[in-house]
Structures are given as structure tokens and as C-alpha cells.
Swiss-Prot record:
It comes from Arabidopsis thaliana. This is DEAD-box ATP-dependent RNA helicase 57. A motif (DEAD box) lies at residues 289-292. Signal peptide: none annotated. Residues 43-72, 517-541 are annotated as: Disordered. GO terms for molecular function: ATP binding; ATP hydrolysis activity; RNA binding; RNA helicase activity. The Q motif is unique to and characteristic of the DEAD box family of RNA helicases and controls ATP binding and hydrolysis. CDD domains: DEADc_DDX52, SF2_C_DEAD. ATP binds at residues 185-192.
């Protein structure tokens, strides 16, 4: 066989007899000049210049050496390698995308939590609890986030609310998210709208199925005021807000009475429950306004009766007050589930917009003289004066009547009509001075009270905060003067601490007094009169 044929068939055992016709075709075919060239599939094409015969290596099919890693890759193999790289790269990118999808919500959640924390810090909002909703940025969010009806936003605008107050920013989203809460915010900070607004949004539309919301207030005056404020907010809707009055308890058929929101004092509501005149099983919202007063020992049985009557398993309870003692907080947690705690500013502190001062009067006679002197120097009505009891309210009223001062008086012995008349005259400016007991210190909103005078030393820090809170409401400035006598000195330190926490200056000697364990400070006081004691004794004889 020729050399070229040998190369072609080298390493094979070809049966020439069996494949004779085919072999003849190959042998007789015309061969090109290039056919004599050696074919090598494992090295690059030889250059045109012929190399010596010795340098031409014939690679045996039995012993094929693997190509070194430095050799140029075959095009076909390189394509497969690049496709593997592409697949590996694609998988890596896919994994990164999946990780980003998982991480992005976490990052966004963390950013949102940071924004919420900054907003709360800006408005001195302190919260504790789980999964707390973000505070409101504006009232417009009530529509975008919660589907608030237009009439509520219109009424808020007409009432002069441009931006939510701090308590409204946080309490409204909490209640709208279906959570229970107890909130402590300074007097005059808009707590009433903070619980009525979400109540109306969640109730959505009026219903004839019975009472769906109950608001409890410790005093009739506060209940009446809450009803007035609520009716301002439902203007333009078909909601019905009713105040529980004495005639209503006696004569009303609550099964036929159209009432969405009922506002009452605990005693009146308890009477209606005991008489089986009212069904509270469908109540969706229960609000305890001025809850620290409602949880006092004298009202606990009444509150317990109302709470049991509101038996709806999905009811949402909320507590609002200007002060939140630890004992009240503990009781609140016993009737609430997974509640959020909201504190605006510092807990149990007076409003920072009220200028506070202590005045030593020495004795009961000295207090009356100090009051007359303050009126002579600068009577800047309207002025609210607080005394310890209804007897002392009557005595002070008799004294001021003789001074030709346009004064009114309100206490629990007066019939409801006279009490309402006294409050209305004071609001209208017909009376410059209103003498009151602590019954009116809770939540009553008198626009523009310039001065509060604690004629009798308050019996607790909580009472002090609520009293002076009638002034300096809704960001206005005000003044609070507290008279004290020798028998009040042991309790000065407690009030001084409250004053300091709201930024007021207190004499150093008062802060050096021993801090006394606080109890109700209601000393027996002499009657209010300008007559000297000797003259009083002569008159008695």
C-alpha cells in the first residue's frame, strides 16, 4: 500500500476481499495534490514552509497525549465552557435577585421604623407595646390610609384643626387598627377627638341595631361637654350621639331609641343596666374618659357593672386621662387585651404653657386677703377658683358677692339646671369668676381661661394637674396660683416636683423639704371669712 493509503488505513485491519468493490473505488479515485498531506486533528495547521521529515510526528491512535492547558482551546469546546459560565452567572444573578426580594421588605420595614421613631421623638410621643401603627402625618392620611368619610375631614377643618395634636397622631391609628390603648396626655391636648374620630370611622355608617359605642365620664358636666364636641364632628352625617340624662334613664325605650354613641356617667348607666332598660351586648367601642378618676374606689363597682354589660367579644376598650397613676395602669391592664400604652410628654406632668407659682398665705384669713390683693393688682378674667368642698365654695361665693365681683359658683348640691346655667354664663363672659370644687376640674374645656387659683391646696398631685389644666389649653398660655398655709407645708414638695417637671422654677428650700408619702390631703380648715376669730366667737355666743 502506498504511503498515503497506509496513513489513511493505519492501525486498522481492513478486509479487502469482503469490501473489494469499495476498495477499488478508493484506489482508482483521482487524488489531489493536497491528499498527500498529513492530517492531524490535534495540532494547528502547518505553515506553508515545509519542515524536515524528522520533525513531522505521527501521533499513534493508541497513545494520544492530552493537550496541555496552555494550548489554544478548540472552538467547539470553548462554546460549551462559555455556556456553563453563563448558566453559573445566571444562577448567581437569580440568587442575588431572590435575596434582594427577601431583604428589600426588611430594609423598607427598618426604614419605616426609623421614620416612625423620629416622628414620635419630634412630638414627644412615648409608646410601648407590640406592632404599633405609625403615627399620622396629617389628617389627609385618614382618607388615604383608613377610608375616612369626607364629612369628618370637613368638620375638623371647620373646627380649626389643621394638623393632628400629638395624642391624635398616635391614638387614632392605634384604635383604627383594632388595638386597645390607654393614653396619658396633657390637659387641653385634644384627647376627646382622639377617641371620637376613630370611633366614627370604624362604625362607618349609622345603624338601628342598638348602641354601638359608649363613652364614660366621671362628671355630668364633662359628659355634656363630650356630647357637644361629638355632635360637632358628626355634622353632615346621620349618626346619633346621645347624652344619658335623668329623664332619659326614667322614660326612654332604648330598644326603639336611635343611638349610635351613648355618653354617660357611670351611676346613670348602671341604673339603666340594673333596670334592664338598656342592652350593651353590641357595643363595639368602650371609652373611659378621665380614667384615673373613674378607677377610684368609689366608682369601681359602677365601672365593673358597665364593663360586664359590654359583652361583645370583639369590643375595643380605651382609656384616656391627663394623669396615669401606676395603680390605674395596673387595673387598666386587667380589663384590656394586648393594649398599647401612649404617653405624651412626661407621665403625670402639668402643661408647660402654664406659668405656675406658689403663694404663702399663712392662714385662712390670709388666703382671702391674698385673693383680694391679686384681684386688685390684676384681675384678668376669666378666672377659675378651686376650693376643697362645696361648703367652702358657698362661703367664698358669699364673700366675693359683697366685693361687687361678677362671680358664679358650681358644686354637687346645685340642681343640674343651675350647674349648667353657671357654666354657660361663665363661657359667655357674663361671669368673670367661677368658684368650683374638683367636680369641674376633670376635662372641662373653657376657652381662654387666663388664670386658675387653687384657693385650697390640692389633695393630690393628680388633682393639681387637672385643676391647672383648665388654663393653657390647646397651646395657649395661662397662669396658675396656689395658696398654701402652715398645714400645707409638709405636702409642698410633692407639688413642687410636678412644677419642676413642667419647667417651672421652685425655691430651693421647698426642694430640700423631706418628701412625704402622698396621701389625700384634706385638712379641716376654718370657714372662709374676713372676720377675725375673736369676732366670730362673740357672734357665736
Amino acid at each position: 500500500m502506498e504511503k498515503s493509503s497506509y496513513f489513511l488505513f493505519g492501525g486498522t485491519n481492513f478486509n479487502k476481499k469482503k469490501f473489494a468493490p469499495d476498495f477499488a473505488k478508493f484506489k482508482n479515485s483521482t487524488e489531489d495534490d493536497d491528499s498527500n498531506k498529513k492530517v492531524n486533528f490535534f495540532v494547528e495547521e502547518e505553515e506553508d514552509t515545509e519542515q524536515p521529515e524528522a520533525e513531522k510526528v505521527i501521533v499513534s491512535s493508541k497513545k494520544r497525549k492530552r493537550r496541555s492547558s496552555n494550548s489554544v482551546p478548540v472552538e467547539g469546546f470553548d462554546v460549551f465552557k462559555s455556556s456553563k459560565k453563563a448558566r453559573a452567572k445566571g444562577k448567581a444573578e437569580e440568587q442575588i435577585t431572590k435575596n434582594e426580594i427577601v431583604e428589600n421588605p426588611k430594609k423598607e420595614l427598618n426604614r419605616q421604623m426609623e421614620r416612625d421613631a423620629l416622628s414620635r421623638k419630634q412630638y414627644s410621643i412615648h409608646v410601648s407595646g407590640n406592632n404599633i401603627p405609625p403615627p399620622l402625618k396629617s389628617f389627609a392620611e385618614l382618607s388615604s390610609r383608613y377610608g375616612c368619610e369626607g364629612y369628618i375631614l370637613r368638620n375638623l377643618a371647620e373646627l380649626g384643626f389643621k394638623e393632628p395634636t400629638p395624642i391624635q397622631r398616635q391614638a387614632i391609628p392605634i384604635l383604627l387598627s383594632g388595638r386597645e390603648c390607654f393614653a396619658c396626655a396633657p390637659t387641653g391636648s385634644g384627647k376627646t377627638f382622639a377617641f371620637i374620630c376613630p370611633m366614627l370611622i370604624k362604625l362607618k355608617r349609622p345603624s338601628t341595631d342598638g348602641i354601638r359605642a359608649v363613652i364614660l365620664s366621671p362628671a355630668r358636666e364633662l359628659a355634656a361637654q363630650t356630647a357637644r364636641e361629638g355632635k360637632k364632628l358628626i355634622k353632615g352625617s346621620n349618626f346619633h350621639i346621645r347624652l344619658m340624662t335623668k329623664p332619659l334613664v326614667k322614660t326612654a325605650d332604648f330598644s326603639k331609641l336611635w343611638c349610635d354613641v351613648l355618653i354617660s356617667t357611670p351611676m346613670r348607666l348602671k341604673r339603666a343596666i340594673k333596670a334592664k332598660k338598656i342592652d350593651l351586648s353590641k357595643v363595639e367601642y368602650l371609652v373611659l374618659d378621665e380614667s384615673d378618676k373613674l378607677f377610684e374606689q368609689s366608682l369601681l363597682k359602677q365601672i365593673d357593672c358597665v364593663v360586664k354589660a359590654c359583652s361583645n367579644p370583639s369590643i375595643i376598650r380605651s382609656l384616656f386621662s391627663a394623669t396615669l397613676p401606676d395603680s390605674v395602669e395596673e387595673l387598666a391592664r386587667s380589663i384590656m387585651h394586648d393594649a398599647v400604652r401612649v404617653i405624651i410628654g412626661r407621665k403625670n406632668t402639668a402643661s408647660e404653657t402654664v406659668k405656675q407659682k406658689l403663694v404663702f398665705a399663712g392662714s385662712e384669713e390670709g388666703k382671702l386677703l391674698a385673693l383680694r390683693q391679686s384681684f386688685a393688682e390684676s384681675l384678668n378674667p376669666p378666672v377659675l377658683i378651686f376650693v376643697q368642698s362645696k361648703e367652702r365654695a358657698k362661703e367664698l361665693y358669699d364673700e366675693l358677692k359683697c366685693e361687687n365681683i361678677r362671680a358664679g359658683v358650681i358644686h354637687s348640691d346645685l340642681p343640674p339646671g343651675e350647674r349648667e346655667n353657671a357654666v354657660d354664663q361663665f363661657r359667655a363672659g357674663e361671669k368673670w369668676v367661677l368658684i368650683a370644687t374638683d367636680v369641674i376640674a376633670r376635662g372641662m374645656d373653657f376657652k381662654g381661661i387666663n388664670c386658675v387659683i387653687n384657693y385650697d391646696f390640692p389633695d393630690s398631685a393628680s388633682a393639681y394637674i387637672h385643676r391647672i389644666g383648665r388654663s393653657g389649653r390647646a397651646g395657649r398660655s395661662g397662669e396658675a396660683i396656689t395658696f398654701y398655709t402652715e398645714q400645707d407645708v409638709p405636702f409642698l414638695r410633692n407639688i413642687a416636683n410636678t412644677m419642676m417637671s413642667s419647667g417651672c422654677e421652685v425655691p430651693s428650700w421647698i426642694m430640700s423639704l423631706k418628701k412625704k408619702k402622698w396621701r389625700k390631703h384634706r385638712p379641716r380648715r376654718d370657714s372662709i371669712s374676713t372676720k377675725p376669730k375673736a369676732d366670730k366667737n362673740d357672734t357665736d355666743e
